[in-house]
């Protein structure tokens, strides 16, 4: 996995990614070992991690390059379901800092599982409502703050949690000034996904941006493009799952892969004065 981090965003960004949101994190030691393994180690990365109440014992975390993202503060936000007080899942992680001289707030997510189909949708809709509340609160407190919502949302861009509750738009032109744009919806429209289930691609891994990231580079930090990172070594080379993400386990068999999800990369640009 350290190899993936070392390769992400290159060659467009020779210094590598500024921030990386990760999920399915067992504990802090896993993140610490990851950033201290070559080639990630040579990037001198830092991280933010908190334990979550999730019953599986998994968390989210943010890895960042302190040369590109100057960390300021962080907080975690639990998902509480009033009608189901015993439900436990991953907290949402808010990390604030400075990137390219601007105030940027990053919300890392891993929304509840899609297992159960429509019956589990209300849980992800509740997670979406929490994400929107956090993002809106940040922007109310500081209207110039640029907000990035990222993570494994366990829903596609068109699903109600993302498109209706969070209100993430399909097209830039349809994004209101106080709204959010789904930078991954265009990929989904092209049939591109980050995970494959029964030969059908899903795009659960998404990045959603506040509208003030949609301006011109001459006026500040701005969105450029999003892509799925699916280098050859991340793809299953043969067998029934050929073309799928090359996961670590195939059933109970260790196959020395990486993940059942491909990462996504979103690029931001700013014109130098």
Model region roles, listed by residue range:
Residues 16-22, 49-50, 81-83, 114-124, ...:
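Second-shell loop/turn segments in exported
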Residues 99-129, 133:
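Metal-dependent phosphoester/phosphodiester hydrolase catalytic core
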Residues 3-4, 89-93, 192:
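Alpha-helical scaffolding within the catalytic cores
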Residues 87, 137-147, 155-273:
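Metal-dependent phosphoester-hydrolase catalytic domains
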